[in-house]
């Protein structure tokens, strides 16, 4: 049968209508998708989503003043990235209840600001002064991952001598970690600030220095129980609650989780094929084999005690980082500070045993420090007659290696 002209016209009309309909439907679907994406971007992000927005106006203003702030006030680095569920379990805090006031410290990657947070401690608690950590503009994906690791890590800790994470703002960029504010800054700067001229009364007594060591040791006991290896115990990575040296309410906490590595660059050494290493605080097995354990943390704590007694001297004075590496590998050790009590010197020496298993536990160290702290010897150094106190008053004599 032949197809007539009207039949062909009808077929063409049907095909044209189908094509036109499909084209219109495609356009409608594309328009709907674009509209939905734009609408979705305007919505507040749901829990756990990370949405890039324009830079926080408040942060931008403070960053404009960053050049006037030095690095001396640095305060505030787990191997796997936290899961989405772990990120969502972090203590989220509304950005509109957080105000940033001034820059406290800045390194190559991170910044720490002082701010206030409304009702962050509890509903109705009012404004609390806080420290706020954020990444610098242009942070890499790796740095952002480390930032999330830090938040997840800190959220696990709950101890009077571990810096507390109060909340996070992760829904938008820039992301923030909200931490308790430690007004005394980092311990290294605090110790160095206590140095006085000859024949002037010390701002920190031996009892004060032992109390500082005890605070840190208590935090280490907790980390040991949590099976957490710090890897970078040092005075620069601890924080002090009070600026005043005579304050009875002073508390020292383990508080680094990153920025100090930016600030005190000279305390680190970049070994070929590895990241920055705090060689002056590292045990032989860490330097030789890259092994880090609670035993290597004990070694580092011994160095931290030495730092405390010398009011913040750099360990192994006069040696370069590479010289320190060879010195420790070959069995060399720090010399005892002048006039250091025998019990404290012996405890430091035990922390630096060549065999890691011969080093004491943090629980034992805490017990021993408490024993020394309350001993008649320590009391005589603190309150004794002029002859026993005189060496402590001449700090340039007492706080120097032999």
UniProtKB/Swiss-Prot annotation:
Alphabetically ordered keywords of this record: ATP-binding, Kinase, Nucleotide-binding, Oncogene, Phosphoprotein, Transferase, Tyrosine-protein kinase
Molecular function GO labels: ATP binding; transmembrane receptor protein tyrosine kinase activity
Entry-linked SUPFAM superfamilies: Protein kinase-like (PK-like)
Protein name: Tyrosine-protein kinase transforming protein ros
A Pfam short name: PK_Tyr_Ser-Thr
EC number: 2.7.10.1
Binding site for ATP: 104-112, 133
Catalytic activity: L-tyrosyl-[protein] + ATP = O-phospho-L-tyrosyl-[protein] + ADP + H(+)
Start and end residues of each Protein kinase domain: 98-377
Modified residues (Phosphotyrosine): 268
Active site (catalytic residues): 232
Top-tier EC class: transferase
Biological process, per Gene Ontology: cell surface receptor protein tyrosine kinase signaling pathway; regulation of TOR signaling
InterPro entries in UniProt: Kinase-like_dom_sf, Prot_kinase_dom, Protein_kinase_ATP_BS, RTK, Ser-Thr/Tyr_kinase_cat_dom, Tyr_kinase_AS, Tyr_kinase_cat_dom, Tyr_kinase_rcpt_2_CS
Organism domain of life: Viruses
Note: This protein is synthesized as a Gag-Ros polyprotein.
Family statement: Belongs to the protein kinase superfamily. Tyr protein kinase family. Insulin receptor subfamily.
GO cellular component terms given for this protein: plasma membrane; receptor complex
Gene: V-ROS
Record Gene3D superfamilies: Phosphorylase Kinase, domain 1 (3.30.200.20), Transferase(Phosphotransferase) domain 1 (1.10.510.10)
């Amino acid at each position: 049968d032949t197809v007539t002209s009207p039949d062909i016209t009808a077929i063409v009309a049907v095909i044209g209508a189908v094509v036109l309909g499909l084209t219109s439907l495609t356009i409608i679907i594309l328009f709907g998708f674009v509209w939905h994406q734009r609408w979705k971007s305007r919505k507040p992000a749901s829990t756990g989503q990370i949405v890039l927005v324009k830079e926080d106006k408040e942060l931008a203003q403070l960053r404009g003043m960053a050049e006037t702030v030095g690095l001396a006030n640095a305060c505030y680095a787990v191997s796997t990235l936290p899961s989405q569920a772990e990120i969502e379990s972090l203590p989220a805090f509304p950005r509109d209840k957080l105000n940033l006031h001034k820059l406290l410290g800045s390194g190559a990657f991170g910044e720490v600001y002082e701010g206030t947070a409304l009702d962050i401690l509890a509903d109705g608690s009012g404004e609390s002064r806080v420290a706020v950590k954020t990444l610098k503009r242009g942070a890499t994906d790796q740095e952002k991952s480390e930032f999330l690791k830090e938040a997840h890590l800190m959220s696990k800790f709950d101890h009077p001598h571990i810096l507390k994470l109060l909340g996070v703002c992760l829904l938008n960029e820039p992301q923030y970690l909200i931490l308790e504010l430690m007004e005394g800054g980092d311990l290294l700067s605090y110790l160095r600030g206590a140095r006085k001229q000859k024949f002037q009364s010390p701002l920190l007594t031996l009892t004060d220095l032992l109390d500082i060591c005890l605070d840190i040791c208590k935090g280490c006991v907790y980390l040991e129980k949590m099976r957490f290896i710090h890897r970078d115990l040092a005075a620069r990575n601890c924080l002090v609650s009070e600026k005043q040296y005579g304050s009875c309410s002073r508390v020292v906490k383990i508080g680094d989780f990153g920025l100090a590595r930016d600030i005190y660059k000279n305390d680190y050494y970049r070994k070929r094929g590895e990241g920055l290493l705090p060689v002056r605080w590292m045990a032989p097995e860490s330097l030789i084999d890259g092994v880090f354990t609670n035993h290597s943390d004990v070694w580092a704590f011994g160095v931290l005690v030495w730092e405390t007694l010398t009011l913040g001297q750099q360990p192994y004075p006069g040696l370069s980082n590479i010289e320190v590496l060879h010195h420790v590998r070959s069995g060399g050790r720090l010399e005892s500070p002048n006039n250091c009590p025998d019990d404290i010197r012996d405890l430091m020496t035990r922390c630096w045993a060549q065999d890691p298993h011969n080093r004491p536990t943090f629980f034992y160290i805490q017990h021993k420090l408490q024993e020394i702290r309350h001993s008649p010897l320590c009391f005589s150094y603190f309150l004794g007659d002029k002859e026993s106190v005189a060496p402590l008053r001449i700090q340039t004599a007492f706080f120097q290696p032999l």
